[in-house]
Amino acid sequence: MVTIGMNYFVIPGKEKVFEDACANVIETMGGIDGHEESSLYRQVGEGEPVYLISSLWAEEEAFKDFIASDAFKKVTNWGKLNILRGRPTHTTYKHD
């Protein structure tokens, strides 16, 4: 098992659009082989909107297949053009 933390920096005023898009993506991810669960979190307090999607995967390879998919690329390209302040970053946490 691995947990992937994906960090997103959202353009101020685009939070609702981002949250709605993430809800759809997380719902779609439910049908992907190797995906266990995902949750969306938002930074609290002042400052620019920052989000984290935490995803649990059966194995890291399943996550890599997902981010290499055309569907993922389409969503991230749309996000870069419309709602994100930069490229998302991710961190992998491996379970023993």
Language-model regions, residue ranges each:
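An amphipathic, aromatic/His-enriched active-site/gating alpha helix that lines ligand/cofactor pockets
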Residues: E27-E36, L56-H90
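Short hydrophobic/aromatic beta-strand micro-patches
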Residues: F9, Y41, S54-L56
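Glycine-rich beta-strand-turn "strand-cap" elements at beta-sheet edges
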Residues: V2, S39-G47, T76-D96
